[in-house]
Amino acid sequence: MDENLPVIRISVRNLVEFILREGDIDNRTGGGPDPENMQMGSRIHRKIQRQMGSDYQAEVPLKTEIACDGFTLKIEGRADGLIHTKEQVMVDEIKGVLRELDRVQEPAGIHLAQAKCYASMVAEQEGLDEIGVQMTYCQMETEEVKRFQYSYQSNELKAWFDEVIRQYEKWAKFQIEWRKARNASIKGIEFPFPYRKGQRDLAVSVYRTILRKKKLFIQAPTGVGKTISTVFPAVKAVGEELGEKIFYLTAKTITRTVAEQAFETLREQNLKFKVITLTAKEKICFCEETSCNPDDCPYAKGHFDRVNDAVYELLMQEDVMSREVLEAQARKHKVCPFEMALDVSTWVDGVICDYNYVFDPDARLRRFFTEGGAGGYLFLIDEAHNLVERGRQMYSAELCKEDFLAVKKLVKGEAPRFAKRLEACNKILLAMKKECENYKVLDNISHFGIQLMNVLSETDRYLEECVDKEVRETVLDFYFQVRSFLNIYDGLDENYVVYTEYQENGRFVLKLFCVNPAANLQKCLDKGNSAVFFSATLLPIQYYKRLLSTEKDNYAVYIDSSFDTKKRLLMNGVDVSTRYTMRSREMYQRYATYIFRVVKAKMGNYLIFFPSYRFMEDVYQEFTQLLASDEEEMELVIQQKHMDEEERENFLRAFEMGREKSLIGFGVLGGIFSEGIDLTNEKLIGTLIIGTGLPQVCNEREILKSYFDQKGLYGFDYAYRYPGMNKVLQAAGRVIRTEDDRGVILLLDERFQKEKGKEIFPKEWADCERCRLDIVEEKIRLFWEKQTDN
C-alpha cells in the first residue's frame, strides 16, 4: 500500500447498511430499542460467548485495506465470535431481539451481509478456501437462542464483497476530491469584517480550544458577533484537518438562520463548504400526517431503493442544503425528505441543527454518535444557557399509571398475555401510588424495570399483528414511551432522582429525573474533538461548566460588551416586589403606574415581562383602567398561553409597523418573546422586567434544591436563582441589539438590590441605578434628552 495516499475509513456495519439497504420506510412496528446498544444486550452477548467453549474466540477485531484509484479504503469491524474447529472456520454474529424466535424465519439481510463481510476478511487473512457463517439470535427476555448456519466458497464471497466495495468507491472518491478542494479554498479566506472590540480574542480562543481538543465556555454580550467569531475559526480548523465536521447546534429556528448567513458570508470569498440545515420531521414531511409507512406515504414506499441516487446527485450539484433544496430533491426522486436529509448530513462539512440531533438519546444522529469511538466533530453550541434544561428533559423519562390501564383496556380481548404484563406493571404503580401523598423519592425500582421489559417485548409482538390503525397508533405511542423509559433506566446513576408524583390533572407518574445532565452530555461531547459553548447569558459561568460537562479543565472567557453604555439606561425600581406576601391590588396598581410613566416619558415600542400569566393579567387589568382615565393613547398587545405560529408573527409584526403612538407588548418572562427575538433601532426602545424570574416552587425544583444542597452546593441558587436570573438577562437583552440602538431597561423588584442578586449581574451592569416610582419618569426624560443632544 502507498502510505502517501489519503485513507478513507468505514466500519463494516456502516458499509453494508449504506450500500445494501433496500425497500420501504415502515414505522408500524416499534422495532425495539437497539439491544446492541443496551447494557442488557451487551450482557447477553457476553453470556453467549462464555458458553461457547475453548474453540470460540470472542470480539475479534478485523480490518482490510483496499487500494483504490488515488486513495486507500480501510474497512474495519469486530466479529462477535470466531470458531475454529477441525472441520471448519466459522464467523459468529450475535443479535439480541425482543420478538419471539419462531417469528425469526431467516436472518435479516443486513445482519447476514455484515457477517459475510467479516467472513470474507477472515478467509483472506487465513487463506481459506471455504468459511462458515453462523447467525445467532437471542430472545432478550427468555434468553432462548436460535442459530442459522451457512457455508461459502471464499472466492465467491470475495467476489460479492468486492462488488459491495466497488459500489462504495464513488462515495469514497467524492470524499477525497471534495476534501482537497475544500481545504484549498479554506486557506484563502479571511475574517470577513473589521474586528469589533473583543471579537478577535474570541475567535483566537475558539481556534486554540479546537487545536488543544478542549471545551470552551464563552460569555459574550449581544453585539460581539458570536456566530461568525465561532464559525470562522472552526472552518479554518477543518481546513487544517483539526476536525472533520462542524455541528452548529441551536435551541431555536431563528439562530439557525444566523448560522446559515455566517457560512454564506464566508462563501463570498469562494469558500467551498457543504452545509445542511436539518428541519424537524413534522415540519418537512410532505404528508398531512407523519405516518411513515408504504401504505400511507408514497415517499416511504421504495425509499431505500432510490435514496442513494438522490443523495449522490445532490452532493454533486449543491453546497447549500437548505430546506427548500432538500424538499425539491426529495420530490424529484420520490423519497422522504427527512430521511434523505439525515443521509446527506453524513457527507457534508457542516450541520446546522437542533441540540437533540446530537444529545437526545431518542433523536440523535446514530450514524455519528452511537457506534465506535470519537469522530473529528467540532461542536459549536449556540445559546448554550438553554442546554441545562433541555439536557434535563432529554435525559429524563416518565410513565403514567393511567396509560397502562388505557392500553390494557384496548388489547385485553385479543392479547390476554399482553394485558397480563400491563396489569403486572399497573399493580406495582398502584402500590407506589398508595405510598405517595404529594411526591415520593424512591431508592430502587428494579422490580418495575424487569416487568417493564416484559411489557416492551409483548408490545413489540402485538404491533406485528395489529391491523386497527387507531389502536396501533395508541399502542405505538405507548411503546415509544416505554422504550425511552427503559433506555434511560438502563443508565441510571448518581445524577438521577427517581420519584413518583401526582400531576395537576390527577394522573400518577413515575419519573426518572436527570438532575445533573453533565455526565450524559459529556458522553456525546466525547464523540467529538472539541466543543464551544457560547451565549450572552452564560452567568455564572461556573454553574454552566458544572452542569454541561464533567471535565474540570475546561476553558472559559468573558468578552466585554462593545456597546456604549451611555446609549442605554439601566435602573432598578426598589419600591416594588413580586414576593407572594407583597402581592395585592395596590402592588399591581403600582406596577401599572410604573409602566405608564416609563412609556409616557418617551413615545415608542416597549416590552413588559411578568413572572406569570396570572400576574400579567392582573397588572394588565389595572393598566387598562389607568389608561382609560388618561388622555394618553397607547396600543396594547398581550401574549396568550397557547399561540400558533401566525399569532406569534402577528405579535412581533406589530413592533415592525410605524405608528403615531406608543406600543406596549405584555409578555411572560422566559416565554417565546423574552428570548431570541431581534427588534433593532426604533422597533423596541424599552423593556420592563417585573420580578427576579425565580421559577415557581414545585416538586421538581424542590428536588433540585435538595440534590444540590446534599452535594455541598447552594441548592436554592441552582434550582431557583440562577435559572431565574438567566431569564432576566435574556429579557433585558432584547433592547440593545446593535451599536446604534438606544433604550431603557427597568428591573422592577427590590430583591435585585440584595448582594446575591447583584453578584451575578454581568460586568456591564455595574452602572445600574436605583429608582422609585416618583422619580422614574424624570430620569427617563433626562436620558432621552441626552440622546437627542448626542
What are these regions (language model features)?
Residues I176-Q219:
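Conserved pre-motif I regulatory segment
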Residues T230, T257, Q261, H333-G350, ...:
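Signature of the SF2 helicase/ATPase Hel1-core->accessory helical subdomain module
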Residues L326-V351, D362-F369, R461-S577, E586-Q589, ...:
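A contiguous, basic/glycine-rich beta-loop/short-helix subdomain that forms a polymer-engagement track
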Residues V574-E586, Q639-F752:
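Conserved RecA-like P-loop NTPase helicase motor core
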